[in-house]
Amino acid sequence: MNTDDLDNFEAEREMQLAQEYQDVVGMFRYAVETDRRFYLANNVDVRVLSEGPRPILEVELNDAWVWDMYRKSRFVPKVKVLSFKDLNVEELPKADI
């Protein structure tokens, strides 16, 4: 497999993932973006584990979908993420649901 084949494979997988996102976004209430991943989830709980210049955040998601083109199954019953970087949690508008 050469570089062009790999680029084409990744582009095709990314397009499939974008289509899957469009198909499933209506099943979820929240969009969650961490420094490493993007998730859709129905329940989100964020806790601050330590304060300071770099606070540690614990994010627990239930009934989630993860944007990851290398996973066979992107539906996950429970996710726990620890982060000390940016975290974005958005409640999806009802019109998008």
Regions found by a protein language model. Name each.
Residues 2-97:
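Conserved RNA-binding domains used in RNP assembly and mRNA/RNA metabolism
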